[in-house]
Amino acid sequence: MRYGEKEIKEFDVENMEVWPNDAKNDYVIKITLPEFMCCCPRSGYPDFATIYLEYIPNKLVVELKAIKLYINTFMYRNVSHEASINEIYNTLKEKLDPKWIKVVGDFNPRGNVHTVIECRSDLVVPQ
C-alpha cells in the first residue's frame, strides 16, 4: 500500500486536525477542493465534483492537509451527492463551530444531469 492510500485509509474524522484561530477580527476562509470523488450508491460508477468550502471561523480553523484527507475518504464510498455534501457540512460545522459556514458540491454532469448541492448555516426556507 502506498503512503497516500495508507493515510486516507487510516484517517479518522474524530481526530481531524484543527488549529486555534487567534485573529481578533472576523474573516472568511475559502477552500476549493477540485478533485472530490465518491461512488454512486446505485450503480457504483464514480461521481466527480468540485467542493467549495467557505466559513467564518470562531475559535478553530481546519488544517488544510486534514481537510484534504477527509475529502479523499469519500473516494470509494457509495454515497449520494446529497448525502456526501450534507455529511461534509455537518462534520465541519460540528468540529469547527464556525460563526457561518457554506459547503457547495458542484458535481460533473453525468447522463446529461448537472447537480449542485449547497448547505449553509444561514439558509432561509421560503414560505
UniProtKB/Swiss-Prot annotation:
Binding-site residues for substrate, renumbered to this chain: V62, E63, L64, H81, E82
Highest taxon, organism lineage: Bacteria
Molecular functions (GO terms): preQ1 synthase activity
Reaction(s) catalysed (UniProt annotation): 7-aminomethyl-7-carbaguanine + 2 NADP(+) = 7-cyano-7-deazaguanine + 2 NADPH + 3 H(+)
GO biological process: queuosine biosynthetic process; tRNA modification
Cell compartment(s), UniProt: Cytoplasm
Involved pathway(s): tRNA modification; tRNA-queuosine biosynthesis
Enzyme class, UniProt record, top EC level: oxidoreductase
Residues of the active site: C40, D47
UniProt-listed Enzyme Commission number(s): 1.7.1.13
GO cellular component labels: cytoplasm
Keywords per UniProt: Cytoplasm, NADP, Oxidoreductase, Queuosine biosynthesis
Known function: Catalyzes the NADPH-dependent reduction of 7-cyano-7-deazaguanine (preQ0) to 7-aminomethyl-7-deazaguanine (preQ1).
UniProt similarity note: Belongs to the GTP cyclohydrolase I family. QueF type 1 subfamily.
Protein name, per record: NADPH-dependent 7-cyano-7-deazaguanine reductase
Organism of provenance: Campylobacter lari (strain RM2100 / D67 / ATCC BAA-1060)
Name of the coding gene: queF
